[in-house]
Amino acid sequence: MKRLVIMAAGTGGHIFPGLAIAETMKARGWQVSWLGTSHGMERELVPKAGVEMDIIEFSGLRGKGLQHTITGAFKLVASFATCFSILKRRNPGIVLGMGGYVTVPGGWMAKLRGVPVVLVNADAALLLSNKTLMPVAERVLFGFPADFGPAASKALVTGNPVRQEIISLPAPAERYAQHSGPLKVLVVGGSLGAKALNDAMPLALAMLPPEQRPVVTHQSGKKNIDALRANYAQAGVDAEVLDFINDMPRRYAEADLVICRAGAITVSELTAAGVASVLVPLLVSTTTHQRDNALWMEKQNAAIHLPQSELSAQGLAELLQGMTREKCKQMAEAAYANGRRDANAAIADVLEKLVKIT
């Protein structure tokens, strides 16, 4: 029996690609389990997908003050012992790190047990957790071509894993031909929401005459749903507001335009499905990954790059007013032309080559 432990924790950007690989490997007859935490999105999403999960109590060491750092250090030490015990019990032939701090103790303990370690790196630049695991990794699978630096000898560009339901959507020309009526806009701030989009979108729609307003579905993030609903009510605008979208493939299929962040997994999904987008990169002082992703998409005529520093209700209203379904379709087709729909199989093939039969 071929056994895989997937290590991933935190946000949807780590969890959904891992679930895509879990589905692929189970279809190939593998036994798959998950190593995660009790406080990340994996706690809810992984069991729903029918994947067994083991939990460690660790959430990283950076930020949040001295007490958090000290407590985190003790939890890190304990997590190594817990991971060793879990891996002994699960007896995997290979482990796959998708990102998040959970991969660090899991990866090192896998190496100690002689289990091959493969890492997925969604962005062109190395994740901090993957840098930490570089000495023990057999392969590092990148979502995008880049200067791989210290990972060069182990690097392989496979593209990012995307859920099969997204890959299997009809091509943009077929989908957009079936759309009619007002534009349908999907606003997604990532699995945790995005306050900048939550603030600007209701005001932007209020500036448009009712007959020119698109039909909007807006994912708020669980912590922001009440505030966002209040924003729409105060603006006098109707919108479908959801804390989390469980049926994203269907939402992509129905949308003419997606307004969202520019994370690597989001971009991979938009290009795999072929959906037009307005990309508002997350402002992070230490990286430019999302900005680079948005600029690349804009260069392919697949998206509009809207820096958060330039995001305003007035500007967003003008952008929406000038948007047509034909323009959206053209961007969607450009996105589709740049999509990789073979990443799941490419990653699965790497795992097949490196696995130890247990």
UniProtKB/Swiss-Prot annotation:
A Pfam family per the record: Glyco_transf_28
GO terms of molecular function: UDP-N-acetyl-D-glucosamine:N-acetylmuramoyl-L-alanyl-D-glutamyl-meso-2,6-diaminopimelyl-D-alanyl-D-alanine-diphosphoundecaprenol 4-beta-N-acetylglucosaminlytransferase activity; undecaprenyldiphospho-muramoylpentapeptide beta-N-acetylglucosaminyltransferase activity
Gene3D superfamilies per UniProt: Glycogen Phosphorylase B
GO biological process: carbohydrate metabolic process; cell division; cell wall organization; lipid glycosylation; peptidoglycan biosynthetic process; regulation of cell shape
Enzyme nomenclature, EC number: 2.4.1.227
Catalysis: reaction(s): di-trans,octa-cis-undecaprenyl diphospho-N-acetyl-alpha-D-muramoyl-L-alanyl-D-glutamyl-meso-2,6-diaminopimeloyl-D-alanyl-D-alanine + UDP-N-acetyl-alpha-D-glucosamine = di-trans,octa-cis-undecaprenyl diphospho-[N-acetyl-alpha-D-glucosaminyl-(1->4)]-N-acetyl-alpha-D-muramoyl-L-alanyl-D-glutamyl-meso-2,6-diaminopimeloyl-D-alanyl-D-alanine + UDP + H(+)
InterPro entries named among the record's database cross-references: GlcNAc_MurG, Glyco_trans_28_C, GlycoTrans_28_N
Keyword Cell wall biogenesis/degradation: yes
Main location: membrane
Keyword list, A-Z: Cell cycle, Cell division, Cell inner membrane, Cell membrane, Cell shape, Cell wall biogenesis/degradation, Glycosyltransferase, Membrane, Peptidoglycan synthesis, Transferase
GO annotation, cellular component aspect: plasma membrane
Pathway(s) the chain acts in: Cell wall biogenesis; peptidoglycan biosynthesis
Class of this enzyme: transferase
Cell wall biogenesis/degradation as UniProt keyword: yes
Membrane topology category: Peripheral membrane protein
Compartments in which it is found: Cell inner membrane
Xref: CDD domains: GT28_MurG (cd03785)
Positions of UDP-N-acetyl-alpha-D-glucosamine binding: T11, G12, G13, R163, S191, I245, Q290
Family according to the record: Belongs to the glycosyltransferase 28 family. MurG subfamily.
Main function: Cell wall formation. Catalyzes the transfer of a GlcNAc subunit on undecaprenyl-pyrophosphoryl-MurNAc-pentapeptide (lipid intermediate I) to form undecaprenyl-pyrophosphoryl-MurNAc-(pentapeptide)GlcNAc (lipid intermediate II).
PANTHER family assigned to the protein according to its UniProt record, in alphabetical order: GLYCOSYLTRANSFERASE, UDP-N-ACETYLGLUCOSAMINE--N-ACETYLMURAMYL-(PENTAPEPTIDE) PYROPHOSPHORYL-UNDECAPRENOL N-ACETYLGLUCOSAMINE TRANSFERASE 1
Annotated protein name in UniProt: UDP-N-acetylglucosamine--N-acetylmuramyl-(pentapeptide) pyrophosphoryl-undecaprenol N-acetylglucosamine transferase
Organism: Janthinobacterium sp. (strain Marseille) (Minibacterium massiliensis)
